[in-house]
């Protein structure tokens, strides 16, 4: 009978599982009245305190019984924190930490115990990650313990200027990334940290380093030459007076046009410490000299000087113009004018010879006054090194003309005054005899 009763209970149990409950409650608790039933009572539908129980992740309304010892988001690096250098040990909070937004707002106002001056260092997205810069917390060395915390706000005030120009270039020009100059009061405090400043602040590569090689535009196909473009030259092209944009600079460097050509060029410039803003407007008018790099412009000026020196018909021009002024009464006055003009040209060429504008890899020390040197540098930057040598070559051709004109004037004067010629020849013969003795 007991066996049949057990089978009936099992059958009713199956019906209860399929049909549900009649009064809204399950029949499972009724099985506890059967003393010899192999089934045990069902566990309650509420959590009981248990040391081994791990609560699942639920929204904040769920309250666990045992206290939470750590912030569940402590493993996530907070981009708005000042990282391990300023981190304070987190207190133990009993129970769920509550709304994280309120906790973060409290941390942002207190800055984890730091002085109130650090609250002005926004936006924090401009700062580089301290872990990446130091390559781990051990790179700080033993000098971190001696670093006073109260001096850190003054030292960190220089961080927003990391992206500012590190050299004397106007604001609208290329931004050159360089080491930040710290004041004397803060240098002692920061010097205790053995940090590579080039890695921390974005070091600038050597200005004499070759950025790329550009084929010449004026050379023939049979003798194509390439010119090396240095980092200093790229910086000069991005700076006043030209202020080239990405499109013009890509044309100067003979880069192929592509969809992301400007972006790739800006990324390449950023690696060498130069920043080319997007949507920049050029400052100077575009000429044919704009397409030339400095090496080719200097080469062109040298060839132009050679042609002026060797091929300019200075003697023919001087004889032609002197025939138009063959009057003996004008020859003396004309000769004086030619001598004065030659002296003025000599002064002009001597001034241009003292020009010390930066060109290529050279940055010579200036000789002239800053006022006149800055004007010559402006002209040299516009012409990329072609201007001053070309002007000197042209003035040299003018001086050759003046020299030939003076020789022609002397011949005309001697032809018109034969007696003076004999007197001069006699005097010259007497001088030669005295010199022989």
UniProtKB/Swiss-Prot annotation:
Signal peptide: none annotated. It comes from the Eukaryota. There is a cross-link at residue 10 (Glycyl lysine isopeptide (Lys-Gly) (interchain with G-Cter in SUMO)). Residues 414-427 have a biased composition (Polar residues). Keywords: Activator, DNA-binding, Isopeptide bond, Nucleus, Phosphoprotein, Transcription, Transcription regulation, Ubl conjugation. Residues 14-107, 414-437 are annotated as: Disordered. Residues 280-410 are annotated as: H-S-H (helix-span-helix), dimerization. A motif (PPxY motif) lies at residues 57-62. Sumoylated on Lys-10; which inhibits transcriptional activity. Induction: All isoforms are induced during retinoic acid-mediated differentiation and by cAMP stimulation of primary astrocytes. Isoform 3 is most strongly induced in the former case, isoform 1 in the latter case. The keyword Nuclease does not apply. Sequence-specific DNA-binding protein that interacts with inducible viral and cellular enhancer elements to regulate transcription of selected genes. AP-2 factors bind to the consensus sequence 5'-GCCNNNGGC-3' and activate genes involved in a large spectrum of important biological functions including proper eye, face, body wall, limb and neural tube development. They also suppress a number of genes including MCAM/MUC18, C/EBP alpha and MYC. AP-2-alpha is the only AP-2 protein required for early morphogenesis of the lens vesicle. This is Transcription factor AP-2-alpha.
């Amino acid at each position: 009978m007991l066996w049949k009763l057990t089978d009936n209970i099992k059958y009713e149990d199956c019906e209860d599982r399929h049909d549900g409950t009649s009064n809204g409650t399950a029949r499972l608790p009724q099985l506890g009245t059967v003393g010899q039933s192999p089934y045990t009572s069902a566990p309650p539908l509420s959590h009981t305190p248990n040391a081994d129980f791990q609560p699942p992740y639920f929204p904040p309304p769920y309250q666990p019984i045992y206290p939470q010892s750590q912030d569940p988001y402590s493993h996530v690096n907070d981009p708005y924190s000042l990282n391990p250098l300023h981190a304070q040990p987190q207190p133990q909070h009993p129970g769920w930490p509550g709304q994280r937004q309120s906790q973060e707002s409290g941390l942002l106002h207190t800055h984890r115990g730091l002085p109130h001056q650090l609250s002005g260092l926004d936006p924090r997205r401009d700062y580089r990650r301290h872990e990446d810069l130091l390559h781990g917390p051990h790179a700080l060395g033993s000098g971190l313990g001696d670093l006073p915390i109260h001096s850190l706000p003054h030292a960190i005030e220089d961080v927003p200027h990391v992206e500012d120009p590190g050299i004397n270039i106007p604001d609208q020009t290329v931004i050159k990334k360089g080491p930040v100059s710290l004041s004397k009061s803060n240098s002692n405090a920061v010097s205790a940290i053995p940090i590579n400043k080039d890695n921390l602040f974005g070091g600038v590569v050597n200005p004499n380093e070759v950025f790329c090689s550009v084929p010449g535009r004026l050379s023939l196909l049979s003798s194509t030459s390439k010119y090396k473009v240095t980092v200093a030259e790229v910086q000069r092209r991005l700076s006043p007076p030209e202020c080239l944009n990405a499109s013009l600079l890509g044309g100067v460097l003979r880069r192929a046009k592509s969809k992301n050509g400007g972006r790739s060029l800006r990324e390449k410039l950023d690696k060498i410490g130069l920043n080319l803003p997007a949507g920049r407007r050029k400052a100077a008018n575009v000429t044919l000299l704009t397409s030339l790099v400095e090496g080719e412009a200097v080469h062109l000026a040298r060839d132009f000087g050679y042609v002026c020196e060797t091929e300019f018909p200075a003697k023919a021009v001087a004889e032609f113009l002197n025939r138009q002024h063959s009057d003996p009464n004008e020859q003396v006055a004309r000769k004086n004018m030619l001598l004065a003009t030659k002296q003025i040209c000599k002064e002009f060429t001597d001034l241009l010879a003292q020009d010390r504008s930066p060109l290529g890899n050279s940055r010579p020390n200036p000789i002239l006054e800053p006022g006149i040197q800055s004007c010559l540098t402006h002209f040299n930057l516009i012409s990329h090194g072609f201007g001053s040598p070309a002007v000197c070559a042209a003035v040299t051709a003018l001086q050759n003309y003046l020299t030939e004109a003076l020789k022609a004037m002397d011949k005309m004067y001697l032809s018109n005054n034969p007696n003076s010629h004999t007197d001069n020849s006699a005097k010259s013969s007497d001088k030669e005899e005295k010199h022989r003795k």
